[in-house]
């Protein structure tokens, strides 16, 4: 099949299907592509091609994920679906599949189940901004009062985890009916995609966010000054703009960018995704090192203490073979560098086993420029033993 060119004329949104095992997430994913393919907006994907998701390695963690893409009249979507519950946990916690929103699938025959709850909690913890609900298998329930009850339960659960349970769209339908082209149920799939279009926000573009670049390397050019290299994480930098240098012991370092170097040419600007060298006025080479960040003044602050949601690699994934306990001191790899930190477990948690996902508090020995949502790996002797993201800043 010819690869379609990425259509940039429509806004791009990353979404995924979440919910309890066997509630119909993969069937729904197949149904969405089938219904949209009939309108010429997607390539049809059958159940088995999505269900046999290839293994991917993200920071050494093995995750099975199916990536599907499709468009509606208004947007272009990249959609992730995971075959197993553990894959969801890893995907969401490590941020391997960044979601701007998600479709929560709940079978009307069962109502909310343990993984329904866990996925909603994870979505809240890792900052998925909005959810839309697809109540599946409605064709197998005869009692309209039961459907009402299940919907009420779902809404209460969403509100409990601080989502807008009163107003979130809940679409009742049948994924299998939609997949089989049954007109009544195809309509519910179309209704679902309208809800996704209208309810899930378009993410702010990286170039619209405040400038930030993690420093990878530093050198000096005779007669020109100090150059810091790295990949711009977000925002735009123009020659002549002021910047601040933070983290890893940087004390009140401010400078002005006098040039942006890319492919050995001096440019006037760099933007998110570019690998650049920034010429910095009045800064000694010794003052900057890998692991610091260069950013728009006042946009980020360095911190040492934070809470995080973490996935701990299993032994099979090359992680630890034994549990860790309170006051465990591994390295935390943020952006471009390792910083030692001390882990405190929540009250009542004695230890953490390989393969667990857990909420921890951390105190680093050096402050790092961070904010909610920042991802990191946990390493021990150079190998990755966990991954996670910051859920709350504590200092």
UniProtKB/Swiss-Prot annotation:
Entry-linked Pfam families: GTP_EFTU (PF00009), GTP_EFTU_D2 (PF03144), GTP_EFTU_D3 (PF03143)
Cellular location of this protein? Cytoplasm
Entry's Gene Ontology cellular component terms: cytosol
Chain positions covered by the region annotation G4: 136-139
Superkingdom as given in the UniProt entry: Bacteria
List every stretch annotated G5: 174-176
- What residues does the tr-type G domain cover? 10-205
Locate the residues binding Mg(2+): 26
Under which EC number(s) is this enzyme classified? 3.6.5.3
As one GO molecular function, the record gives: GTP binding
Catalysed reaction(s) here are: GTP + H2O = GDP + phosphate + H(+)
Cysteine pairs bridged by disulfides in the record? none
Q: Where is this region: G3?
A: 81-84
UniProt record similarity statement: Belongs to the TRAFAC class translation factor GTPase superfamily. Classic translation factor GTPase family. EF-Tu/EF-1A subfamily.
Q: Please describe the quaternary structure of this protein.
A: Monomer.
Task of the protein: GTP hydrolase that promotes the GTP-dependent binding of aminoacyl-tRNA to the A-site of ribosomes during protein biosynthesis.
Q: What is this protein called?
A: Elongation factor Tu
Q: Which gene encodes it?
A: tuf
């Amino acid at each position: 099949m010819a690869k379609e060119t990425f259509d940039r004329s429509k806004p791009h949104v990353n979404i995924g299907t979440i919910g309890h095992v066997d509630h119909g997430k993969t069937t729904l994913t197949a149904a969405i592509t089938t219904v949209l393919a009939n309108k010429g907006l997607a390539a049809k994907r059958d159940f088995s091609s999505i269900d046999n998701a290839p293994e991917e390695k993200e920071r050494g963690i093995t995750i099975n994920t199916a990536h599907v893409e499709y468009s509606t009249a208004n947007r272009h979507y990249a959609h992730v679906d995971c075959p197993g519950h553990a894959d969801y946990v890893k995907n969401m916690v490590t941020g391997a599949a960044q979601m701007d929103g998600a479709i929560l699938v709940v079978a009307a025959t069962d109502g909310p189940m343990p993984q329904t709850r866990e996925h909603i909690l994870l979505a809240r913890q890792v900052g998925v901004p909005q959810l839309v609900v697809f109540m599946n298998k409605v064709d197998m329930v005869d009692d309209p009062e039961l459907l009402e009850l299940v919907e009420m339960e779902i809404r209460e659960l969403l509100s409990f985890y601080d989502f807008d349970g009163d107003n979130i769209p809940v679409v009742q339908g049948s994924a299998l009916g939609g997949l089989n082209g049954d007109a009544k149920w195809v309509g519910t799939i179309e209704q679902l995609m309208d809800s996704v279009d209208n309810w899930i926000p378009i993410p702010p573009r990286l170039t619209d966010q405040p400038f930030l670049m993690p420093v990878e390397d530093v050198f000096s050019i005779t007669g020109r000054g100090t150059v810091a290299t790295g990949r711009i994480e977000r925002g735009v930098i123009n020659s002549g703009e002021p910047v601040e240098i933070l983290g890893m012991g940087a004390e009140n370092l401010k400078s002005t960018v006098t040039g942006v170097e890319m492919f050995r040419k001096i440019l006037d600007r760099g933007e998110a995704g570019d690998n650049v060298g920034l010429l910095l006025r009045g800064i000694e080479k010794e003052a900057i090192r890998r692991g610091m960040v260069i950013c728009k003044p006042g946009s980020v602050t360095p911190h040492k203490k934070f809470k995080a949601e973490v996935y701990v690699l299993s032994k099979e994934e090359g992680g630890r073979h034994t549990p860790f306990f309170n006051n465990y001191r591994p390295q935390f790899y943020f952006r471009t560098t390792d910083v030692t930190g001390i882990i405190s477990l929540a009250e009542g948690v004695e230890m953490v086993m390989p393969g667990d996902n857990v909420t921890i508090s951390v105190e680093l020995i050096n402050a790092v420029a961070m904010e909610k949502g920042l991802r990191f790996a946990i390493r021990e002797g150079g190998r990755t033993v966990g991954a996670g993201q910051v859920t709350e800043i504590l200092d």
